[in-house]
Design a protein with these regions (language model features):
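C-terminal capping/gating helix-and-loop segments adjacent to ligand/active sites or protein-protein/ligand interfaces
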Residues: 137, 220, 310, 355-361, ...
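Hinge/lid segment of periplasmic solute-binding proteins
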Residues: 74, 99-152, 176, 182, ...
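Short, solvent-exposed loop/beta-turn-alpha elements that line the ligand-binding surface or hinge
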Residues: 115-128, 211-233, 283-285, 297-307, ...
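Conserved N-terminal structural module of periplasmic/extracytoplasmic solute-binding proteins
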Residues: 21-108, 119-122, 168, 302-304, ...
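Extracytoplasmic/periplasmic substrate-recognition and gating elements
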Residues: 57-62, 67, 164, 244, ...
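A structural signal for short loop-to-beta-strand junctions that line the ligand-binding cleft
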Residues: 93, 124-159, 188-194, 302-309, ...
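Glycine-centered hinge/linker elements that transmit conformational signals in sensory
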Residues: 181-182, 221-251
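Extracytoplasmic/periplasmic solute-binding protein
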Residues: 139, 143-147, 152, 176-224, ...
């Protein structure tokens, strides 16, 4: 019995020592460094997210007392892992997460409130675009901050517009007239691929010009119908473009990636895409001739027509546990200040990621002419971004129905009324 008590005492002592060591390692290690475990949604951050990686690299260089331990996994594995870790309350200190899952973690009380960080850094708070902040704020609690901007719109080949004497459009009427000219000359106006039904970015922004964000909350609550006059008018405009031959004749069988190649080959005047294709376009034979446009305004639209699309694709989150560790919290706040400050922003820009803030940045126009044009559009006076992408604020099934409705009209499968009805029925089905 005596031996058992001694053994039990030794086990408890070892346990206390190990617990103490673990606690010390979680904050400041023996070498005086504080470690931040940062989980990211790619397996190789250095290669797959070079802009992000270089910000972290520079931060560590300027803060030798802080080590950022990057934990990289491909997105699906990363998201699954975060969900599993949340069940045992072992979340990483800082991590990337999908918006819907981030909201669930906030609801479960597992995230640090970042409101104080913004209040203590008014320069960053005022520089960040409002929709970047508001997307991850619930009842006054700032539970996340944007990882990087998601910028979408229409790339256009100015050489084709010049060749056929067509001006760069501003209004829907301009776009429809341009489509007629291009159709006569065997040129596709807007290259698209219905096989990848999510590839409707610019058309989702157009939907925002018909009052989408004024209506969607009431629509989801059952107080209004998606099948309303304004949204039907929106689909009518897509149908008009179809009738004047604006889309590829093989749009139903073409993929998004084939649509990109069609544009790069000079066979289409425009491409519905986003910032991720800038480098590929710049390196192509048409690169020097390409510009970027937010899409047309509509005379029958609802509300502000100068709507751009600079939104946050996903947030960075800080675990509540990390916020309760004084050393970690201090290190994390330093990292966030660097990431969203002028230095971090410029490093992002140097690596072809457009700014999330209104900070003045320097772009090497000679090396990256299209990226410079995109940044100019992001910072264009008088244009304000939609709150988010319309498909990102509804359940996935409804988002998919929206894709189907848009391509259904482009393909000639649905009438405008049928398109609106398809989405409305999906909303009713999942209530």
């Amino acid at each position: 019995m005596k031996k058992f008590k001694i053994l039990l005492s030794l086990v408890m002592l070892i346990g206390l020592i190990l617990a103490g060591c673990g606690k010390e390692e979680s904050a400041t290690s023996a070498d005086g460094k504080t470690t931040i475990d940062f989980a990211i949604h790619v397996a190789n951050p250095k290669e797959q997210e070079p802009a992000f990686y270089k910000v972290i690299e520079k931060f560590q260089e300027e803060n030798p007392d802080i080590k950022v331990n990057l934990i990289g996994k491909e997105q699906q594995e990363h998201v699954k892992g975060i969900k599993m870790q949340s069940q045992s309350d072992k979340l990483p200190d800082v991590f990337w997460m999908l918006p819907a899952s981030a909201a669930e973690l906030e609801k479960a009380g597992m995230l640090m409130d970042l409101t104080g960080f913004l209040d203590d850094n008014p320069d960053i708070k005022s520089a960040l675009k409002p929709n970047m902040i508001n997307s991850f704020n619930k009842d006054g609690r700032q539970y996340g901050l944007p990882y990087q901007p998601l910028i979408t719109g229409l790339f256009y080949n100015k050489a084709l517009f010049d060749k056929y004497g067509v001006k760069i459009p501003e209004t829907f009427e301009d776009l429809a007239e341009a489509a007629k000219v291009f159709e006569k000359n065997g040129i596709t106006t807007i290259s698209k691929g219905a096989k990848d039904d999510y590839s409707v970015w610019a058309f989702l922004t157009m939907l925002s010009r018909y009052g989408y964000f004024d209506k969607i909350d009431n629509i989801l609550a059952g107080k209004e119908s998606y099948n309303n006059a304004d949204f039907v008018n929106y689909y009518k405009k897509i149908d008009e473009l179809r009738k004047v031959g604006a889309f590829p004749k093989n749009v139903t069988t073409q993929t998004y990636f084939q649509a990109v190649e069609q544009f790069l080959a000079g066979k289409a005047a425009m491409l519905d895409s986003g910032m991720w294709d800038v480098q590929k376009i710049e390196q192509s034979p048409i690169g020097k001739d390409v510009g970027f446009w937010w899409g047309p305004t509509f005379t029958d639209g609802v509300g502000d027509q100068k709507v751009s699309s600079v939104v946050s694709s996903a947030p960075l989150l800080v675990s509540k546990k990390a916020g309760e560790d004084k050393a970690k919290k201090e290190a994390i706040l330093k990292l966030l200040k660097f990431y969203y400050g002028e230095k971090g922003t410029q490093i992002m820009v140097d690596n072809q990621v457009a700014p999330m803030t209104n900070a003045t940045v320097n772009v090497d126009e000679a090396a990256h002419p299209l990226f410079k044009k995109l940044v100019d559009q992001v910072q264009l006076k008088g244009w304000n971004s939609q709150q988010n992408q319309p498909d990102l604020v509804v359940p996935e099934a409804i988002g998919s129905a929206m894709y189907d409705s848009i391509y259904g009209v482009i393909n000639g499968t649905y009438t405008p009324v049928q398109a609106a009805k398809i989405v409305d029925e999906k909303i009713s089905a999942i209530k």
